[in-house]
């Protein structure tokens, strides 16, 4: 198409304040032909015709008023437009309809002026006060540069220069009717400047005062296209209202779906208003009722010839009026807008390509700006998270150092316990040596008893004692066998522990190497990740949540470890106290041993004295030789005992060496652990350095946080492993303590056996002394009878006192037994309470398992639903992509079919390409939304995995609780066994008391026998005295004297025997007193042990309660996580609904574009190439354009 005029300058903004159109009467067909061929109309006919004035004024909310006035006799119609800036007044400053002039239009016919090059939403005309020459073209007006937004720019009539007549100028006299109309419109605003501030009064320079070119002298299309290529800006409406209002520069640079058609400022303003104005405005009947004049377009339809602009307007008006309830003004506005939009269809493909390139560049600039803003927002958050992680790493390093100190302390305590074990083993060896010596002495006494076979009561007593000694020896041998078996078991356990320790050390070394490799790999990944791109924000949030949960768990674990360390410290203090008590007991035993050795030395000295006396007074040498032989045998036995003692010492040293080796192995393992801790500290330092480097690199902040999380997880794993190793050391220390306790028990049993053997030895020694004294009894004198009598009386008194003491001690023992029974009942009650607590714990564990199973099922169902939704979305997206591709293929085929046509088909294909790009952009947004959904799903899956991990942790905790319960049961069994041992000891004590009673009865019977012997001796003494008195008077033979001497010797022997029995009774009384003291000490120790066990059980019960509370808190936390997951699922459903709505809108838009393109292509195929203008303004293409959803009327 040919253009009306050319412009030297670039086009400026068009004012929508006032538009004036001169309407003339129609002319004949000949004149139309001349006009179409570019000819001029005669001046006479132009002056003879009448004309009307159509004035458009901006009204309420951008809706125009149409006022028609009759004109004067003059020239034909000229299109005139008064231009100004596009500043709109506020929507509230509106005027009523009465202030506008009424329509006085009386003509029903007008000539349709042909305006191919018009760029406004109405035809433009020019009014001249004087004689105007007709050029069949409208003057293309140009507004000045924009001024300040507070004042509107005035209008200026500026005509394009005419090449044919360079000397002619244009009269720019003001228009009175237009000025009066403008003044009346501006006077209604009440002092507020609305629309234009006044008419432009700028005078044109002489080089611009030229007439417009006629149709014969128009520029060719090439120059017009070049001028249109010089348009600097192309506007694209934004989809958001606030973005357009906030940033006009970005909106001016973008290009929307109508950017390919925008060739004038008025079209741009219409598109802007279509995106800004609400949809309800067009349907408000109160807003659409405007005052209008008779229908001009209907009159034009009656007279306009086919193919002209008025004919096109009439067809558009008829199409829009059919079946619509809108007012005439809105329909006319739409008609003008449709004409405006159809003009850019003639644009060349080069300009469209430039527009598309600019739109793509603007989109890229916006995307880059958004990315920069997001990175700037993310940077402070990442820096704060990095600082928090560094603090946490420092805290973990401090905790590692504390754990190392605890390990060193516990190693020292283990060494002390091993030393004490060695001491206990030495004591046990010494007791075994003493036992062997006593056995040798017993054998000697047995040999002597076999040699002496005289049937005397003393020998019978000796036989009984020997039988008892044999029983005791058998018991001691059985205990020895048990001890040996126990020691063998311990040695086997030690060997097994050695193998297990070696395996654990090897596995630990492998794990350390694996951790080192992982650390190196992680360091390399860190260095690589510093150079990589940033990750998504959703993944960051998920990682932060994980880090927060991990920090909370670590804090809980730290609290638990602190509590456990306090508990273990208290246990160690108790063990230290017990070790101190055992040391004191050992010192007491040593003192008693020294006392016993002193007593033995005194007895040996007494024996030596008696032997000397026996040597002096013995008549035979045979007895002396026998005594010498016995002494030699005793010396040999002493040597054998010394050799056995040396052998036992060698065995003890060997055991000590083995224990030292075990301690060295454990120390080496502790050193390995320390080295591992040092390596962990080094890795932590490396992590800190990496963190500092990552803080310098702002771009890789998110990747750094992720890698730090992994590193921290590895450190936490290593810390947990160290804690487990510490627990293993604690268990080993407990095992050593148990071994100590068992050794103490064995030592106590050995001491008891030693005491019994000592008693038996003392008895046998006393009997030996009595036999030796019996040999020398014949040599003692009668004078010792009185002293023996007195001594017997004193001894009887002492025996009575000892019996009273024994009765008191028996009462005390009965009371102690009653107290022990009460303690046993209390233990039974505590046992029942513990069983009830165990039952409650089992119930809570079952409940926790059920709740965990329910949570797992819920999470699985939610995951399945999300997966199904994802699959649905994927299928929908695939279908949409396939539909879009099919439509694109159809459009491409249509474009290929119509490629041989005219240039308008190229424009259409370009527009279709732009629509395809827009649809591809929509698809990209849909894909982005799908990716966001996928990332959300990944986050939910990660949360589900976290829940599973928490469930596994709960299961582990439950297993730990079950193990603790089993330990408590084992400890209860141990308590039962200790109670049974106590009962056995009590029964033994009772048996010993019974034995003491029987011994007392024997002593009483012996005392009675002695009293009887005393009485008989007194009688015999009296008889002897009487006989002496009678023998003084006469001499008796020597036979009677010899008899008397023999009787005297017998009496002396009896007295010596009685003295010996007294000494034996005193020794037995002393032994009984010592035994009672030992029993009382044992009972006190057992009471303390029972109390300590009660305290331990109470502490464990408290710990179990605390663990139950923690389990309940964990359950509450899991419920909170489940609720959070449900909320996120609901949010995901909402997002899905929004996406579905968006997809529906995209489908509608694509369907509309496809139908429009199909209609336009069908209409273009039926058109001829000769009638470009008619084909462009065809009613079918107009109808396809009017079907767009975003088509709305713009203000003037």
Swiss-Prot record:
The protein, known as: Cingulin
Organism: Canis lupus familiaris
Stretches the record annotates as Interaction with TJP1/ZO1: 54-67
Domain of life assignment: Eukaryota
Comment, domains: Deletion of the TJP1/ZO1 interaction motif (ZIM) decreases but does not abolish colocalization with TJP1/ZO1.
Any one of the GO BP annotations: microtubule cytoskeleton organization
Residues recorded as bearing Phosphoserine in the entry: 95-96, 98, 135, 137, 140, 155, 165, 214, 274, 1168-1169, 1175
Keywords recorded for this protein, A-Z: Acetylation, Cell junction, Coiled coil, Phosphoprotein, Tight junction
Region feature Head, mapped onto this chain: 7-354
Polar residues bias: start-end ranges: 95-105, 245-256
GO cellular component entries: bicellular tight junction; myosin complex
Residues carrying N6-acetyllysine: 576
Coiled coil segments of this chain: 355-1150
Sequence segments annotated as region (Disordered): 82-105, 183-263, 884-906, 1023-1061, 1149-1174
Motif position, ZIM: 48-62
Biased composition annotated in UniProt, kind: Low complexity: 1038-1050
Tail: region residues: 1155-1196
Chief site of localization: other
Compartment annotation: Cell junction, Tight junction
Pfam families: Myosin_tail_1 (PF01576)
Subunit note: Homodimer. Interacts with TJP1/ZO1 and SPEF1.
One GO MF term: microtubule binding
């Amino acid at each position: 198409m040919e253009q009306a005029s050319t412009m030297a300058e670039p086009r400026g903004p068009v004012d929508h304040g006032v538009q004036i159109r001169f309407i003339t009467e129609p002319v004949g067909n000949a004149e139309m032909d001349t006009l179409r061929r570019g000819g001029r109309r005669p001046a006479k006919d132009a002056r003879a015709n009448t004309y009307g004035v159509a004035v458009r004024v901006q009204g309420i909310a951008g809706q125009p008023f149409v006022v028609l006035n009759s004109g004067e006799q003059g020239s034909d119609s000229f299109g005139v437009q008064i231009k100004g800036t596009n500043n709109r007044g506020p929507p509230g400053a509106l005027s009523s309809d009465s202030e506008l002039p009424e329509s006085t239009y009386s003509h029903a016919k007008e000539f349709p002026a042909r305006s191919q090059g018009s760029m406004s939403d109405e035809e433009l005309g020019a009014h001249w006060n004087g004689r105007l020459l007709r050029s069949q073209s409208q003057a293309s007006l140009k507004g000045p540069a924009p001024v300040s937004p507070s004042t509107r720019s005035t209008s200026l009539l500026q005509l394009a220069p005419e090449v044919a007549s360079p000397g002619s100028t244009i009269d720019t006299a003001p228009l009175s009717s237009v000025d009066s109309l403008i003044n009346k419109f501006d006077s209604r605003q009440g002092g507020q400047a609305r629309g234009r501030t006044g008419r432009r009064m700028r005078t044109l320079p002489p080089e611009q005062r030229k007439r417009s070119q006629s149709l014969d002298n128009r520029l060719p299309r090439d120059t017009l296209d070049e001028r249109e290529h010089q348009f600097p800006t192309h506007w694209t409406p934004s989809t958001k209202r606030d973005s357009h209002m906030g940033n006009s520069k970005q909106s001016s640079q973008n290009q929307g779906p109508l950017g390919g058609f925008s060739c004038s400022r008025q079209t741009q303003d219409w598109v802007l208003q279509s995106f800004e104005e609400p949809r309800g405005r067009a349907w408000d009947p109160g807003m659409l009722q405007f005052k209008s004049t008779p229908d001009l377009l209907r009159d034009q339809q009656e007279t306009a010839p086919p193919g002209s602009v008025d004919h096109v307007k009439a067809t558009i008006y008829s199409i829009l009026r059919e079946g619509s309830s809108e007012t005439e003004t809105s329909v006319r506005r739409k008609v003008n807008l449709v004409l405006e939009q159809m003009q850019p269809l003639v644009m060349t493909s080069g300009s469209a390509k430039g527009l598309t390139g600019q739109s793509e560049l603007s989109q890229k600039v916006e995307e880059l700006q958004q990315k920069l803003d997001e990175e700037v927002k993310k940077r402070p958050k990442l820096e704060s998270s990095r600082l928090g992680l560094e603090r946490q790493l420092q805290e973990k390093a401090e905790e590692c150092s504390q754990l190392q100190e605890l390990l060193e302390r516990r190693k020292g305590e283990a060494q002390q316990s091993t030393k004490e074990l060695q001491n206990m083993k030495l004591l046990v060896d010494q007791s075994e040596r003493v036992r062997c010596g006593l056995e040798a002495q017993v054998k000697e006494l047995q040999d002597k008893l076999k040699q002496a076979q005289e049937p005397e009561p003393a020998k019978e007593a000796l036989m009984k004692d020997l039988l008892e000694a044999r029983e005791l020896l058998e018991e001691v041998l059985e205990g020895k066998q048990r001890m040996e078996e126990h020691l063998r078991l311990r040695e086997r356990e030690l060997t097994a522990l050695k193998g297990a320790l070696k395996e654990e050390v090897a596995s630990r070394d492998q794990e350390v190497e694996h951790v080192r490799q992982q650390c190196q790999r992680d360091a390399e990944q860190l260095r690589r990740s510093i150079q990589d791109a940033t990750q998504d924000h959703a993944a960051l949030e998920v990682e932060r949540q994980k880090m927060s949960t991990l920090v909370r768990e670590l804090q809980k674990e730290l609290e638990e470890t602190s509590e456990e360390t306090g508990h273990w410290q208290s246990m160690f203090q108790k063990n230290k106290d017990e070790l101190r008590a055992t040391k004191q007991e050992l010192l007491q035993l040593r003192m008693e041993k020294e006392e016993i050795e002193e007593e033995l030395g005194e007895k040996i000295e007494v024996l030596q004295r008696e032997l000397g006396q026996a040597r002096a007074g013995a008549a035979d040498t045979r007895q002396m030789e026998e005594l010498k032989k016995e002494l030699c045998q005793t010396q040999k036995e002493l040597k054998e005992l010394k050799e056995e003692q040396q052998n036992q010492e060698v065995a003890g040293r060997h055991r000590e060496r083995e224990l030292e080796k075990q301690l060295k192995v454990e120390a080496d393992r502790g050193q390995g652990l320390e080295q591992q801790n040092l390596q962990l500290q080094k890795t932590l330092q490396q992590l800190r350095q990496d963190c500092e480097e990552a803080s310098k690199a702002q771009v890789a902040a998110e990747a750094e946080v992720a890698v730090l999380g992994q590193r921290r997880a590895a450190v936490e794993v290593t810390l947990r492993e160290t804690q487990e190793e510490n627990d293993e050391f604690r268990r080993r220390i407990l095992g050593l303590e148990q071994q100590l306790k068992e050794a103490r028990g064995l030592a106590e049993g050995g001491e008891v056996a030693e005491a019994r053997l000592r008693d038996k030895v003392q008895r046998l020694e006393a009997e030996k002394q009595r036999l030796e004294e019996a040999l020398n009894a014949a040599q003692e004198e009668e004078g010792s009878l009185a002293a023996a009598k007195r001594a017997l009386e004193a001894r009887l008194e002492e025996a009575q006192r000892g019996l009273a003491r024994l009765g008191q001690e028996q009462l005390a023992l009965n009371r102690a037994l009653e107290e022990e029974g009460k303690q046993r009942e209390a233990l039974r009650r505590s046992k029942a309470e513990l069983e009830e607590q165990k039952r409650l714990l089992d119930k809570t564990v079952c409940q926790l398992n059920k709740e965990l199973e329910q949570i797992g099922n819920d999470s699985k169902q939610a995951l399945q639903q999300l997966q199904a939704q994802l699959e649905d979305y994927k299928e929908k997206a695939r279908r949409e992509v396939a539909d879009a591709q099919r439509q694109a293929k159809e459009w491409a085929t249509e474009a290929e079919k119509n490629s041989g046509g005219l240039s308008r088909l190229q424009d259409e294909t370009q527009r279709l390409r732009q629509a395809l790009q827009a649809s591809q952009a929509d698809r990209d947004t849909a894909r982005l939304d799908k990716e966001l959904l996928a990332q959300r799903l990944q986050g939910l899956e990660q949360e589900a995995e976290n829940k599973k991990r928490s469930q596994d942790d709960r299961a582990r905790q439950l297993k730990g609780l079950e193990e603790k319960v089993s330990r408590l049961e084992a400890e209860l069994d141990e308590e039962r066994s200790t109670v049974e041992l106590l009962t056995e000891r009590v029964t033994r004590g009772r048996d010993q008391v019974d034995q003491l009673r029987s011994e007392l009865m024997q002593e009483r019977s012996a005392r009675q026998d002695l009293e009887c012997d005393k009485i008989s001796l007194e009688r015999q003494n009296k008889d002897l005295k009487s006989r002496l008195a009678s023998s003084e008077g006469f001499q008796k033979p020597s036979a009677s004297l010899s008899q008397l001497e023999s009787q005297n010797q017998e009496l002396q022997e009896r007295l010596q025997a009685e003295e010996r029995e007294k000494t034996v009774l005193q020794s037995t009384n002393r032994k009984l007193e010592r035994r009672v003291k030992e029993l009382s000490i044992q009972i006190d120790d057992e009471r303390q042990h029972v109390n300590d066990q009660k305290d331990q059980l109470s502490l464990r019960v408290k710990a179990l309660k605390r663990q139950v509370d923690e389990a309940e808190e964990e359950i509450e936390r899991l419920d909170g996580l489940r609720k959070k997951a449900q909320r996120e699922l609901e949010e995901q459903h909402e997002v899905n609904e929004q996406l579905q709505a968006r997809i529906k809108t995209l489908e509608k838009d694509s369907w509309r574009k496809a139908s429009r393109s199909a209609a336009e292509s069908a209409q273009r195929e039926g058109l001829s190439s000769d009638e470009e203008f008619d084909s462009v303004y065809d009613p079918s293409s107009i109808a396809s354009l009017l079907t767009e959803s975003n088509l709305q009327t713009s203000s003037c």
